[in-house]
């Protein structure tokens, strides 16, 4: 929808990772090498020792693509703020029986970014407090609005509704979301090709509601067809540096921090984020080749009983570890 201009020009976006992890903290890996003497588990320990949005990619990735970051725009300035740590400190105290005078990460961190083209992004991180799971995913455009949580909803001005070919079933103004009938028609019209291809089987297979399957299938599709991936190395740098830049901001009284241009000036060369697709005949050829390769590997596994070799090597490694 964003790529087809349904919301007009998107001027602001929000994303988040809001997930109360209290039921899960104790399940995270506890490194036996002595680096975690309190046995907090790697994730709680990391939050204890590091300040900032330490899990930014969930919230930032989708909105960065919707805003064409380094494909016509770039992040320019960042400011981050956090709350004090209450829940985190209390957890450590309850877990260890000792006070926790130093806990770096706040219960909630909010990061604001402004782009070269004057747009704004807000990203939140909160894995401590009691609230429903939420990744926000809000797009605010000159002609419309979309939000993902707590359920997908849309609001479009009259002109945008007409241009989208959605039936005008009742009078809408800027205070109302679209009716279910209108929303269903809008979603059906703009259903993404990737969802059309993998949506049904993804729901059947599962894995974070099918998201895992779709991401894996899409990556494999791109590799099999020799296509660029949906995320590149610049996305990796831009999305992940939020933690370090946010720390710099907050450790300096929430000062503004310049966002590095990882593209070294080439952020405006490619225009607009796009998914790459193979021609139907090339796609069919790649799928057939992949199927044949998989079948050949299965036959080789059966012929050489490769699982037995794997089990032997695994047993050797276990004995070696036990001797240490």
Q: Over which residues does each language-model region extend?
A:
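A short catalytic or substrate-binding loop motif that flags glycine-/basic-rich loops and adjacent residues
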Residues: 57-58, 102-107, 115-116, 130-131
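Active-site beta-strand termini and strand-to-loop segments that position acidic
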Residues: 111-117, 139-141
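Short glycine/serine/proline-enriched coil/turn segments at secondary-structure junctions
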Residues: 21-23, 129-132
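Predominantly a Rossmann-like dinucleotide-binding segment in NAD(P)-dependent oxidoreductases
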Residues: 1-103, 253
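A structural signal for well-ordered alpha-helical scaffolds and beta->alpha junctions
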Residues: 10, 56-60, 106, 212-216, ...
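C-terminal helical cap and adjacent loop that interface with cofactors, partners, or active-site loops
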Residues: 64, 132-140, 145-150, 158-324
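Beta-strand scaffold of nucleotide-dependent catalytic cores
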Residues: 73, 122-125, 148-149
């Amino acid at each position: 929808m964003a790529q087809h201009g349904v919301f007009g020009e998107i001027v602001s976006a929000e994303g988040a990772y809001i997930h109360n992890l209290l039921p899960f903290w104790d399940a995270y890996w506890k490194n036996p090498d002595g680096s975690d003497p309190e046995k907090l588990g790697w994730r709680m320990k990391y939050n204890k020792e590091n300040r900032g949005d330490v899990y930014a990619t969930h919230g930032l990735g989708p909105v960065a693509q919707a805003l064409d970051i380094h494909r016509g725009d770039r992040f320019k300035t960042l400011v981050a703020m956090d709350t004090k740590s209450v829940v985190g400190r209390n957890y450590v105290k309850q877990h260890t029986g000792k006070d926790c005078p130093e806990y770096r990460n706040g219960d909630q961190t909010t990061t604001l970014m402004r782009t070269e083209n004057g747009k704004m992004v807000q990203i939140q991180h909160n894995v401590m407090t009691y609230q429903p799971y939420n990744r926000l995913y809000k797009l605010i455009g000159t002609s419309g609005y979309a939000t993902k949580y707590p359920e997908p909803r849309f609001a479009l001005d009259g002109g945008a509704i007409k241009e989208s070919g959605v039936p005008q079933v009742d009078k809408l103004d800027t205070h109302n979301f679209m009716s279910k009938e209108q929303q269903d028609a809008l979603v059906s019209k703009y259903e993404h090709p990737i969802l059309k291809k993998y949506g049904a089987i993804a729901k059947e297979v599962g894995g974070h509601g099918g998201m895992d399957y779709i991401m894996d299938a899409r990556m494999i599709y791109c590799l099999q067809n020799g296509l660029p991936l949906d995320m590149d190395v610049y996305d990796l740098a831009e999305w992940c540096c939020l933690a370090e830049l946010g720390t710099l901001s907050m450790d300096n009284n929430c000062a503004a921090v310049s966002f590095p241009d990882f593209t070294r000036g080439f952020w405006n060369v490619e225009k607009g984020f796009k998914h790459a697709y193979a021609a139907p005949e090339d796609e069919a050829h790649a799928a057939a080749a992949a199927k044949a390769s998989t079948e050949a590997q299965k036959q080789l596994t059966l012929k050489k009983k490769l699982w037995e070799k794997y089990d032997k090597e695994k047993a050797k490694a276990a004995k070696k570890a036990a001797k240490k």
